[in-house]
């Protein structure tokens, strides 16, 4: 049955000049002609997103509809908005789009496993946003396109400004999900990441109903078919660490875990570019080519050379490109059951070990805690690192209660006998301002040892406060780096800082999950 949105949209798309499923070259050409961006010397399209250079979580809403009212975990992440307000907003957005000379439509999929994929349609006011959608979502074959029937529609009108008094929003910016109308409305922001993350939120609602765990993680596979998952918030190293020349990338950010195995929800990568270098991240560097979308990168107008060290517009500079741009990427993005899971955190206190082994209960505890430091630039208003506990390493995108996802994870770890590691890509030798960021070469060496089974052969000691198992040695990593206390000049300062962080873990868990005492027992202990 067609929703009202689809009926109204069909009328509009018939009345306006609409470009359906344009190839990359056409979209790049039109974006440049329309003044939406400029080409770099490598042929990538660089677009500036204005004042919104990150997501706007305070402007995200879910329509409070009867069919989902009792399922949604309502609160600051999933703010309710009435059906009446949604309908008023939708009507005004569609009327606004009707006044446009040109619109752009992409038809594709979310979910590489055909059993679980969601056919989607993305309607854009901007050509470059449509190019972004084409690069980030799964592109259909000609046969699939001919038979394509959208089950969820994203309508993105960045220049439309909401009126909070009329539309029930917090500001002129809005990201509104309606599960009954199968529609996402986005406006008042030009930050393209809102498209990708709104569809991820949709999948986080729909997949668990089919016994599939949706995950904010990257995934890759070794030459022997061994699959690894990397969980972590923005800036913790998911994209970087999963782009491993000795392994094959399944995907860099969003996956589902079913009884069939792991599958990429997307068809592209959305890599952070700040301080990007050919030496540090050769795969990402080479992926920035014709068809790639750069967001908010400082590009020299005269030479068209991108300056990735510059944070002129934001620290949250990005590159969006199809997963095929990574050599050896797995196409379609499906793999077997995972062997190893890595939780990534960027600990700004310099307290957590660079790598430690977790049992199932500890894995569920750290999954529910989702600790990291909020990295500057990925959200508006964050310019210095802050402690953040983001449930399941992805709380902004979870419509259901977090324990639903944690219990699914625990069950799958048990069933598949998966080994879980916690890796700190953050600070060592002290907190931010005193210590330094963990060397990427060390982190890579530790992750490699975890994936190839070398960490199964070494001795471990339990961390006195956090209870996790810390290896006493690791190939290609100095032993003193493995014990964070050893890297601090003043051991008493470390002890105080560690106790402080542990107390924050405990306080966060008790506040959010008062009924999960069995999992809480796997957390840190303060003497």
Swiss-Prot record:
Source domain of life: Bacteria
Cofactor(s) of this protein: Mn(2+)
This protein's UniProt keywords: ATP-binding, Cytoplasm, Decarboxylase, Gluconeogenesis, Lyase, Manganese, Metal-binding, Nucleotide-binding
Transmembrane parts of this sequence: none
Sequence positions that bind substrate: 55, 191, 197, 318
Reaction equation(s) it catalyzes: oxaloacetate + ATP = phosphoenolpyruvate + ADP + CO2
Chain residues that bind ATP: 197, 216, 232-240, 281, 318, 443
Keyword Nucleotide-binding annotated: yes
Cofactor detail note: Binds 1 Mn(2+) ion per subunit.
GO biological process entries: gluconeogenesis
Record pathway: Carbohydrate biosynthesis; gluconeogenesis
Location(s) in or outside the cell: Cytoplasm
Entry protein name: Phosphoenolpyruvate carboxykinase (ATP)
Taxonomic lineage of the native organism: Bacteria, Bacillati, Bacillota, Bacilli, Bacillales
